[in-house]
Amino acid sequence: VHLSSEEKGLITSLWGKIDIEQTGGEALGRLLIVYPWTSRFFDHFGDLSSAKAVLGNAKVLAHGAKVLVSFGDAIKNLDNLKGTFAKLSELHCDKLHVDPENFKLLGNVLVICLAEHFGKDFTIDAQVAWQKLVAGVANALAHKYH
């Protein structure tokens, strides 16, 4: 993924304002609610039977924060996403057998969460930059599958 210096600036400036725990938990929670088939990878998380159960599930919130911390690693290494996510790609492919399409879904849900949290501060240019980033992360996570 090629990001201009302006796009990198938009990503890093917004990243500094994100509440990792809240936004990460919300993004993973939304993924599980909007795309319920993704919950099969989280059977060990307990009750995921309703939107309320998902959004109140401590394991969902904690794992969502962990996922967003990984996005922080991406932001620190925007020019080497494949290298940054090599081990996670291997884990998700070889051990967890996650459908790589789910990485794209999560990225898009994250962008929706950012738009909701930041409103008009999440400009079209910011969305373009973040869409490129989440696509790059999804690609890097899917790398081991190819």
From Swiss-Prot:
S-nitrosocysteine found at: 93
Modified residues (N-acetylvaline): 1
Entry keyword set: Acetylation, Heme, Iron, Metal-binding, Oxygen transport, Phosphoprotein, S-nitrosylation, Transport
InterPro entries the record matches: Globin, Globin-like_sf, Globin/Proto, Hemoglobin_b, Hemoglobin_oxygen_transport
Expressed in which tissues: Red blood cells.
Residue sites binding heme b per the record: 63, 92
Classification via SUPFAM superfamilies: Globin-like (SSF46458)
Biological process per Gene Ontology, one example term: hydrogen peroxide catabolic process
Gene3D superfamilies linked: Globins
Any matching Pfam family: Globin
Globin domain sequence ranges: 2-146
PANTHER family for the chain: HEMOGLOBIN FAMILY MEMBER, HEMOGLOBIN SUBUNIT EPSILON
Family: Belongs to the globin family.
Protein name: Hemoglobin subunit beta
Source organism of the structure: Potorous tridactylus
Organism taxonomic ancestry: Eukaryota, Metazoa, Chordata, Craniata, Vertebrata
